[in-house]
Structure formats: structure tokens, C-alpha cells
Regions:
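C-terminal capping alpha-helices of c-type cytochrome domains
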Residues: 132-179, 267-269, 275, 285-341
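Short glycine/threonine-rich turn/loop motifs
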Residues: 22-119, 183-294, 301-303, 328-341
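Glycine-rich, positively charged N-terminal anion/phosphate-binding segment
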Residues: 129
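Class I S-adenosyl-L-methionine-dependent methyltransferase module
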Residues: 125-126, 152
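Helix-loop "lid/cap" segments that line or gate small-molecule binding pockets
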Residues: 121-122, 135
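Positively charged n-region of N-terminal signal peptides that target proteins for export
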Residues: 1-5
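Bacterial N-terminal signal peptides
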Residues: 6-17
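Phosphate/oxyanion-binding loops and surfaces in catalytic or ligand/nucleic-acid-binding neighborhoods
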Residues: 69, 98-102, 120, 142, ...
Length: 341
């Protein structure tokens, strides 16, 4: 069943306040910086590097290991496993629509996709390489990569870490999911949502979720690249969910900035494709989407949402699932026999 919103509700939905500019569709393409325009050659190279486990110390972990683009762009683990079976401290966020974030990582420590791509290879838990020089040396020792770098960046000394990061970022900018039922609604098709999804949209606005989750990506307002949108979590530390799900054990952005004022501050995540990205929260402690809605209502809004409200909001979140871009595994250049010695 599809539902046409009554005019009174439409007026409320598009009224002043946080919801005024809220209902925006996801753009059909992701923005790219002036120094890294997206090209087919960069995307092809970036996809290869994204899938290549040889960028890790053990030759066993790739970007794809934690951000599975064949499904929801994450790994469905509370926290991810890296080299030598080590476990990270935070939930792997989805890579889908990451291109619409103005900063990257839960704590916003990377100002761009290009800089984010340089982080995991040298994280001692994730991919375990000693430094970025070691990463690019590993790539240079795979001769089959050089023609792809030259196609993407021209002749000369182009097999560099900066170019590798640019290529990965270019590929990630193709990982977007416009065209959801919600996007059709936001473009003017008021019959695109079911009755329950329409109620969920209204509840989402009425209870205050849009104070954080606004904009086309439902991750906050559009900001200049490198300027992140952060919110305190939990806002109401007396919520019983704080202890139940250990929500304050991680200092959040303060771990990156070393500023005590940033304790408990987190980059606001996207709500798109949530049905594909369980478990939830920065520590992956909440297993189901209805429970995540209850947790956020309590910790952020000091509200105990009814079962009906939770069900309607979850239905609305289902309308944020867009068609995923088709993905295939790339063929990688052959491995020299001494590469992983």
C-alpha cells in the first residue's frame, strides 16, 4: 500500500525548524575535490587497491575485509578483525555513501576520503604495515600495478601513496545509493512511501531525530570538506542503556584531538541502508535496529518511544535503502614470489 500524505501533514513536515530543509534526495553523483576529479581509470585502479590484501602486513586483510561492498559496506561484526586476528575497538561504518561525509572515521580524524584511505594500512590492528613508505613499496614491488597508475595519473613517477589514496577515494565515490523510496518521495512522489513509512517520517521529525540526522545523507548539514558535524553521545548519561551497552567507555573524538572537551563527541553517521549494517553504535553493541531506535530515543532525546513509534521509525528507515551499485571482484596483478617475505 502507498500513502499520500494529507496536506496538513505535509505542511508540518516541511515547516520551519530542523525539518525545514530536511527532506532532500541523495545526489546522483558524489562530489570530488578539484585535485582529484573522478575518472574511469582512477576508479579501476582504486577498486583493485581496495580489494587487494597485499597492502597489509600479512597479505590477508584488505579494505574489502571490513567494508564488504557485496552487501552493506561493513562486516556485521561488533568490531572488526585485523591482522593476526587482532580486534579493533570500533564498529566498521559502511563505505556506501561515505563520499557524502565531510570528514571520515567515527571521530572525524580524516578530513577526506583520500586521507582516510591512508589510515587503515598503517593501523597496527587493522592492516599492520609499519608506515606509508612500506605500503607504497609493497605496491611498487607488484609490477603489474604500474600501467594502471600510468593510465590514471600519466607517465613518470606516479606510483605514489598520494595517488594510491586518490584512486581508492575515486572508487569509493562510486559507492553511493540514490534512488530509494525516500528519494522518490523527496523528489515529489508523495505516494512513494507506505502508510507506515510516512508515519515513521513524521515521528522521526516530531520527536527530534532531525536535530542530528538531517540532510540528504541523514548525517547532518552540508559542510565544507574537512569540517565535521559532531554531536555528544550520549546526551543523557543517566539512560539505563548507557551502562547496558557500555556507551561511554570510548572517549570518542577526544581520542584523536586529545582535547577533553571532545570527550563523547562523535561524527553523526548516515542512516541510509541501516537495515544492512547491523550491529549498531560506535562499539557495535546493539544488535537490532528497533533496539537501536529505543537506545537513541533514550540517550539522545530523553524519550521512551512506544512500540508503535519504534516500528514506524524502523519502517521509515527501510525506505532509506537504495539500489546498490553492481560490484564484481577485480582481477589483481600477479604476486612476485618474494613479496611477502
Amino acid at each position: 500500500m502507498r500513502y499520500r500524505l494529507p496536506s496538513a501533514i505535509l505542511l508540518m513536515t516541511f515547516a520551519a525548524g530542523a525539518a525545514q530543509a530536511q527532506w532532500q534526495p541523495l545526489p546522483e553523483s558524489a562530489p570530488a575535490p578539484a585535485d582529484n576529479p573522478t575518472t574511469a581509470a582512477k576508479v579501476e585502479l582504486g577498486k583493485m587497491l581496495y580489494f587487494d590484501p597485499r597492502l597489509s602486513a600479512t597479505g590477508t586483510v584488505s579494505c574489502f575485509s571490513c567494508h564488504n561492498v557485496m552487501e552493506g559496506g561493513d562486516d556485521h561484526m561488533p568490531t572488526s578483525a585485523g591482522v593476526h586476528g587482532l580486534k579493533g575497538g570500533r564498529n566498521a561504518p559502511t563505505v556506501f555513501n561515505a563520499a557524502f561525509h565531510s570528514v571520515q572515521f567515527w571521530d572525524g580524524r580524516a578530513p577526506s576520503l583520500e586521507e582516510q584511505a591512508k589510515g587503515p594500512p598503517v593501523n597496527p590492528i587493522e592492516m599492520g604495515m609499519p608506515n606509508l613508505d612500506a605500503v607504497i613499496d609493497r605496491i611498487r614491488h607488484i609490477p603489474g600495478y604500474k600501467p594502471y597508475f600510468e593510465q590514471a595519473f600519466g607517465a613518470g613517477d606516479v606510483v605514489t601513496m598520494d595517488n594510491a589514496a586518490k584512486a581508492i577515494a575515486a572508487y569509493e565515490r562510486t559507492l553511493i545509493t540514490p534512488g530509494s523510496a525516500y528519494d522518490k518521495f523527496a523528489k515529489g512522489d508523495k505516494t512513494a512511501l507506505t502508510a507506515q513509512q510516512a508515519r515513521g517520517l513524521q515521528t522521526f521529525a516530531d520527536v527530534g531525530c532531525v536535530s542530528c540526522h538531517s540532510g540528504p545523507n541523514f548525517s547532518g548539514p552540508a559542510l565544507p570538506q574537512g569540517e565535521g558535524f559532531f554531536m555528544k553521545f550520549p546526551t543523557f548519561p543517566d539512560s539505563p542503556y548507557v551502562v547496558k551497552y557500555k556507551l561511554t567507555e570510548d572517549p570518542g573524538r577526544a581520542a584523536a584531538t586529545k582535547d577533553p572537551a571532545d570527550t563523547g563527541m562523535w561524527r553523526v553517521p548516515t542512516l541510509r541502508n541501516l537495515v544492512y549494517t547491523a550491529p549498531y553504535m560506535h562499539n557495535g553493541a546493539v544488535k537490532t535496529l528497533p533496539e537501536a531506535v529505543r537506545v537513541m530515543g533514550s540517550t539522545q532525546l530523553n524519550k521512551s518511544l512506544s512500540d508503535a513509534e519504534v516500528a514506524d521509525i524502523v519502517a521509515f528507515f527501510e525506505s532509506l535503502t537504495g539500489p546498490f551499485p553492481a560490484q564484481t571482484m577485480p582481477r589483481l596483478p600477479p604476486t612476485p614470489g618474494d613479496l611477502l617475505e
